[in-house]
């Protein structure tokens, strides 16, 4: 049974097809992202002429994996479609500021290869500090 409720689905699968991230790939140890600290309700914050700050734009979140095995990462990145795609629209379930989970339609961005750190080589390669960004979140 999954410990967290981070989920993902393609546009074709819809919200009904959301799959728990902890079940992706065939590996020894599945992990969930640490997404709570990275949820922002707005894209940018601006200061009005009166000096008050307000939020503008879509919410966004980052799923940060301290360590993730290659099969789980490959299965997660498959939601981008082709290996050359840098982003794609998907459905996700992610944790928000009040510690509840909510469904969104979002744009998923491929993590930069230069930002991933290869870790120990056991049965599977383990990648460290992998960030998967989701922008333009629209509540479903």
Which role does the model predict for each range below?
Residues 1-140:
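Extracellular/virion structural assembly segments
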């Amino acid at each position: 049974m999954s410990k967290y409720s981070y989920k993902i689905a393609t546009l074709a699968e819809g919200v009904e097809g959301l799959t728990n991230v902890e079940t992706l790939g065939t590996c020894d140890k599945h992990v969930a992202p640490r997404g709570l600290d990275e949820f922002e309700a707005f894209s940018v914050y601006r200061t009005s002429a009166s000096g008050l700050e307000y939020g503008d734009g879509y919410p966004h979140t980052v799923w940060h994996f301290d360590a993730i095995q290659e099969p789980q990462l490959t299965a997660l990145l498959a939601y981008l479609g082709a290996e050359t795609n840098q982003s794609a629209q998907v459905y996700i379930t992610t944790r928000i500021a009040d510690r509840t989970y909510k469904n969104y339609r979002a744009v998923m961005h491929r993590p930069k290869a230069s930002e991933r750190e290869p870790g120990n080589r056991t049965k599977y390669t383990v990648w460290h500090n992998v960030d998967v960004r989701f922008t333009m979140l629209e509540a479903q």
